[in-house]
């Protein structure tokens, strides 16, 4: 696998090349997206997002977001339902709540008078079922599938559509530089580490090395181990993480260091106190670390928070 810092650099080269082709600012431009094709008549100035999962990327590439849907407030959000990793930036830029609790509101969308709406094809914040309604109302809608793309790839896609190619490239470069600087302060464990999603909705899973979280740890100089080969027949569901039963968790945690997805210090304490894990080396040596609440999905802002969490946990003497 390519080290992530080199992947970032490659993406930046791609986007700079595309910028050279599109930087003349030619409008309209036609873009393909997850629901078809859209002709954008001029550079968007009033963007609304119905997908909080993408709002952070839009903010990172300096898109003119005027409003975003909000999810249900939780430990992952502020009191409005904006994800905590980008909520402050959104507030500073005057981003309003389009609607709350992911309850789609076509009247709120129309009332915002967007010149472009960003929607997702998958996930709890998808409004794909309302795509026909949106287009019938004359709302230019761009649908993005974030289920199988990194935030950098999505930034490139959005940058091309919005005429923000340079801004997308700059966001990737900033992130790459931030990771590189943090890596200088880290003393990586000698052996590989595991990423564990521990008791999230009563489920247990182990991160794959090629997951966004795994790639980011590797960019910081760590080696990431996936699920042991002998447990593969026990996998109940697979995505970026491979799900197993709680009974199989001890056999899954064979590394001497563990990072907890979406983990806080409270989660670390629960992991260390779990009797089924008492004999694991990571538990015995208390080398279990939180990746922070926002690490469940990596974008520009949550990725930086995860970098900070790892740097804090593994700070070189």
Describe the role of every protein-language-model region:
Residues 154, 160, 248-317:
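Structured C-terminal subdomain patch of bacterial secreted/periplasmic proteins
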Residues 1-8:
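Bacterial N-terminal signal peptides that target proteins for export
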Residues 16-22:
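Sec/Tat signal peptide C-region and signal peptidase I cleavage site
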Residues 37, 126-202, 296, 300-317:
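Extracytoplasmic substrate-binding proteins
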Residues 46-61, 168-228:
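Basic- and aromatic-lined ligand-binding clefts that recognize polyanionic substrates
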Residues 55-103:
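A short, structured surface patch at a secondary-structure boundary
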Residues 73-78, 125-129, 145-157, 192-219, ...:
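Extracytoplasmic ligand-binding site segments that recognize negatively charged/polar headgroups
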Residues 106, 110-119, 139, 249, ...:
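Proline-aspartate-enriched helix->loop->beta-strand connector
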């Amino acid at each position: 696998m390519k080290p992530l810092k080199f992947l970032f650099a490659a993406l930046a080269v791609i986007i700079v090349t595309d910028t050279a082709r599109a930087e003349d600012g030619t409008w309209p431009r036609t873009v393909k997206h997850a629901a078809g094709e859209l002709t954008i008549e001029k550079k968007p100035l009033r963007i609304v997002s119905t997908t909080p999962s993408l709002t952070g990327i839009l903010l990172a590439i300096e898109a003119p977001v005027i409003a975003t849907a909000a999810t249900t407030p939780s430990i992952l959000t502020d009191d409005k339902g904006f994800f905590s990793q980008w909520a402050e930036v959104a507030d500073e830029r005057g981003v309003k709540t389009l609607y709350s609790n992911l309850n789609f509101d076509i009247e709120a969308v129309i009332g915002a008078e967007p010149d472009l709406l960003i929607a997702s094809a998958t996930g709890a914040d998808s409004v794909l079922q309302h795509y026909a309604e949106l287009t019938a109302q004359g709302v230019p809608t761009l649908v993005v599938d974030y289920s199988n793309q990194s935030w950098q790839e999505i930034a490139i896609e959005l940058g091309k559509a919005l005429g923000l190619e340079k801004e997308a490239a700059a966001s990737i470069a900033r992130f790459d530089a931030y990771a590189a600087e943090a890596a200088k302060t880290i003393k990586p464990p000698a052996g590989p580490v595991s990423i564990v999603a521990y008791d999230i909705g009563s489920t247990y899973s182990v991160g794959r090395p090629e997951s966004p979280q795994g790639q980011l740890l590797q960019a910081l100089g760590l080696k990431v181990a996936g699920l042991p080969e002998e447990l593969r027949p026990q996998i109940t569901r697979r995505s970026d993480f491979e799900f197993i039963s709680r009974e199989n968790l001890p056999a899954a945690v064979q590394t001497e260091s563990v990072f907890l997805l979406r983990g806080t210090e409270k989660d670390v304490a629960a992991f260390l106190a779990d009797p089924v894990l008492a004999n694991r080396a990571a538990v015995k040596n208390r080398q279990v670390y939180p990746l922070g609440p926002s690490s469940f999905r990596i974008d520009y802002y949550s990725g930086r928070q995860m970098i900070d969490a790892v740097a804090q946990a593994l700070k070189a003497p």
